A protein has these predicted regions:
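Glycine-rich nucleotide phosphate-binding loop and flanking beta-alpha elements
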Residues: 70
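Non-catalytic, conserved peripheral segments adjacent to functional cores
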Residues: 1-60, 73, 77-78, 85, ...
């Protein structure tokens, strides 16, 4: 899967609640601030986020295991991100957690974020836990 984003665009935090996907993420062009949130309820790092800067210059890639929500923001004018996923897309089980959730407290390096309507309407981390993990 390939994704294109412009500077200041934030996508996420996305997860499939059924057949959760592991993702291998790389940047072909540009630079992104990539975030993964651990949603595995029995994990020692449950509710914690991990962030990485991925770019065409540093050539870093990351693997995000199943059970993590994923999001990123574009840091350059044009950003091309490629994913290799461990499961097929399951649109019926796609969910989103607010990128700016107060509990998660992710410090996005963007002053004026551009966010899709879908992601603006995402639920809080607390509501996600209540609805899908308890």
């Amino acid at each position: 899967v390939m994704s294109y984003s412009k500077k200041n665009v934030i996508r996420g935090l996305h997860i499939q609640t059924k057949k959760s996907q592991g993702k291998f993420v790389s940047v072909l062009k540009g630079k992104v601030y990539d975030v993964a949130v651990d949603l595995r309820k029995n994990s020692k790092t449950f509710g914690k986020f991990f962030s990485y800067v991925l770019s065409e210059k540093n050539s870093h890639s990351i693997y995000i295991p199943p059970g993590f929500a994923h999001g990123f923001c574009g840091l350059e004018k044009e950003n091309y991100i490629i994913y290799s996923c461990t499961q097929y897309r399951n649109a019926a089980s796609e969910r989103a957690i607010k990128y700016n959730d107060k509990k998660l407290n992710i410090k996005w390096p963007v002053k004026k974020p551009v966010v899709s309507k879908k992601d603006q309407n995402a639920i809080t981390f607390f509501k996600f836990k209540e609805k899908y993990l308890l």
